[in-house]
């Protein structure tokens, strides 16, 4: 019995294995190591054995019985297996067992050694209970490794045509059983909101600044503006409009913008102002055409207003002194 160490793996050529791995060590080879260190050696020498790999006939063993036949492993179990052909001259493999069958899934994966050197292929299979096509899928999965490319069987001698493969079998845990179930909270545990008391603080606007200053204007101080169309004037003098513009601004502020009074009084005061201004113009010899225009304006006015205008005209054009005229102008400006 000879014990040989090859590339860090303890191999036993015949007899029982003599090596026991210390605690903490696990047998977890890569895909390339399975092809180059184990399968190739088994194909070249059928008597080749490994400490961590046993031999099994997958057509006569159920997947849940394989862990008992394994030499090593806790979750993954490795075996050397021979393909069972359905027909002597065919390439199809018999994958049925007594209680079910192995079904290939997905695409075969290429296994390379070094830089682009194809050495093998890996096929994934899932075990189904019953018979196809109505089998029941289980969580037992198998990875089947075979030689390909450089290590293909066609490049090996005829004695190696038995087509050995390496199978890795494991039970895939269901994610729903490994994770803790979600705990449901009953509706009664939630705080009930029977009223709007919990959101009163959201409706409190006392902390917000007012949109309008309350002291700016009270209800009694609000003006009652009445739309009044100001009278039009037809004056051809280049100097007279200046005086009318000045007085018109006064009327717009004190007469038309006032909340009290009537339209009749406003028009009456306007005519008095016009007559006084015309008299001043005649005394200063600024314009000789204003009289005619003002006369026309007086004739258009109503009866009561005409009487007041004539009285005003008599007062201005009568035997009044120059001082009285100045006092009249002062009163007009004060108005």
UniProtKB/Swiss-Prot annotation:
Domain NAC: start-end pairs: 21-172
Keyword hit for Transcription: yes
DNA-binding region: 119-178
GO cellular component, one term: cytoplasm
Record's keyword terms, sorted: DNA-binding, Nucleus, Transcription, Transcription regulation
Any one GO molecular function term: transcription cis-regulatory region binding
Subcellular location: Nucleus
Top-level lineage group: Eukaryota
Function as written in the Swiss-Prot or TrEMBL entry: Binds to the promoter regions of genes involved in chlorophyll catabolic processes, such as NYC1, SGR1, SGR2 and PAO.
Entry's free-text remark on domains: The NAC domain includes a DNA binding domain and a dimerization domain.
The protein, known as: NAC domain-containing protein 87
């Amino acid at each position: 019995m000879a014990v040989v160490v090859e590339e860090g793996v303890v191999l036993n050529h015949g007899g029982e294995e003599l090596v026991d791995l210390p605690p903490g060590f696990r047998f977890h080879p890569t895909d390339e190591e399975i092809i180059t260190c184990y399968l190739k050696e088994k194909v070249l020498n059928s008597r080749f054995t490994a400490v961590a790999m046993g031999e099994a006939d997958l057509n006569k063993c159920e997947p849940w019985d394989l862990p008992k036949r394994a030499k090593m492993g806790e979750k993954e179990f490795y075996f050397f297996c021979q393909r069972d052909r359905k027909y002597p001259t065919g390439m199809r493999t018999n994958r049925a067992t007594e209680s079910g069958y192995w079904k290939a899934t997905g695409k075969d994966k290429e296994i390379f050694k070094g830089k682009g050197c194809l050495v093998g292929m890996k096929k994934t299979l899932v075990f189904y209970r019953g018979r196809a096509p109505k089998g029941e899928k289980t969580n037992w999965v198998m990875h089947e490794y075979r030689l390909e490319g450089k290590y293909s069987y066609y490049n090996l001698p005829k004695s190696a045509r038995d087509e050995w493969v390496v199978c890795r079998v494991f039970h895939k845990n269901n994610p729903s059983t490994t994770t803790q179930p979600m705990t449901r909270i009953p509706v009664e545990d939630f705080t009930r909101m029977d009223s709007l008391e919990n959101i009163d603080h959201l409706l409190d606007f006392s902390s917000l600044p007012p949109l309008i200053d309350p002291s700016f204007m009270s209800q009694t101080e609000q003006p009652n503006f009445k739309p009044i169309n100001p009278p039009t004037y037809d004056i051809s003098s280049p100097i007279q409009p200046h005086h009318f513009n000045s007085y018109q601004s006064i009327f717009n502020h004190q007469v038309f913008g006032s909340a009290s009074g009537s339209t009749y009084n406003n028009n009456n005061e306007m005519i008095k102002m016009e007559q006084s201004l015309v008299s001043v113009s005649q005394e200063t010899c600024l314009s000789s055409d204003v009289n005619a225009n003002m006369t026309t304006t007086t004739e258009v006015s109503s009866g009561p207003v005409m009487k007041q205008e004539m009285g005003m005209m008599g007062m201005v054009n009568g035997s009044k002194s120059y001082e009285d005229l100045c006092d009249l102008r002062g009163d007009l400006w004060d108005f």
